[in-house]
C-alpha cells in the first residue's frame, strides 16, 4: 500500500477525496494502511450477492465497503434521497407495509427528502452484460462522483476495470 498512498498523496488536491471499494479482510488492511486519512465508510448494499462458491461455508456477500479517505474536508455536495426504501431511517409501522407508503401515514411524511445514510441500496448491474467481474453500477458511480466533486473537476479511476466511470 505504501506505493499507492505515495502516488495518491502526490496527485490529490487539498480538498480531494479518495474512495476505494473493497470487502473484508481487504478493507481492514486498506484502512490500516492510512489511518490518518481514513474518515468513514459507505456500505453499498447489493441486490445481487456474490461468492456463491463459498455458499456452503459462509454467508453470501451482499454488500461492499466504500472507504472514504481525505486529508482536509473534501467537496461534499449533499444529494438527498426521496423518502423510500432506499433510505435507512424509513418509518417503522407495525400495521403497514412500509415499502408501499406514500404521503403522510400515521404522522410520518415518507416523501420528504432525506440526507444520505451510510448504507445505500443501488441495484447491481446485470452480470450477463458485465465487462468485468467487479463492475459497479453506473448509478452508484454517478452518485459518488456528484457527491464528492464539482463540474469540470478531474476524476482519477486507477482501479478502472471496465471503464464504468467513463
What are these regions (language model features)?
Residues 1-166:
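Core catalytic lobe of class I
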Amino acid at each position: 500500500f505504501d506505493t499507492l498512498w505515495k502516488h495518491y498523496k502526490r496527485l490529490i488536491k487539498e480538498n480531494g477525496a479518495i474512495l476505494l471499494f473493497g470487502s473484508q479482510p481487504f478493507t481492514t488492511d486498506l484502512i490500516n494502511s492510512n489511518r490518518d486519512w481514513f474518515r468513514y465508510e459507505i456500505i453499498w448494499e447489493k441486490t445481487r450477492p456474490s461468492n456463491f462458491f463459498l455458499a456452503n461455508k459462509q454467508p453470501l456477500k451482499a454488500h461492499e465497503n466504500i472507504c472514504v479517505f481525505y486529508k482536509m474536508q473534501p467537496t461534499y455536495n449533499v444529494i438527498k434521497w426521496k423518502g423510500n426504501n432506499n433510505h435507512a431511517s424509513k418509518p417503522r409501522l407495525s400495521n403497514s407495509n412500509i415499502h408501499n407508503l406514500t404521503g403522510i401515514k400515521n404522522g410520518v411524511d415518507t416523501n420528504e427528502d432525506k440526507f444520505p445514510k451510510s448504507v445505500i441500496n443501488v441495484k447491481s448491474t446485470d452480470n450477463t452484460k458485465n465487462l468485468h467481474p467487479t463492475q459497479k453500477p453506473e448509478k452508484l458511480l454517478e452518485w459518488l462522483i456528484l457527491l464528492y466533486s464539482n463540474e469540470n473537476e478531474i476524476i482519477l479511476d486507477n482501479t478502472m476495470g471496465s471503464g464504468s466511470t467513463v
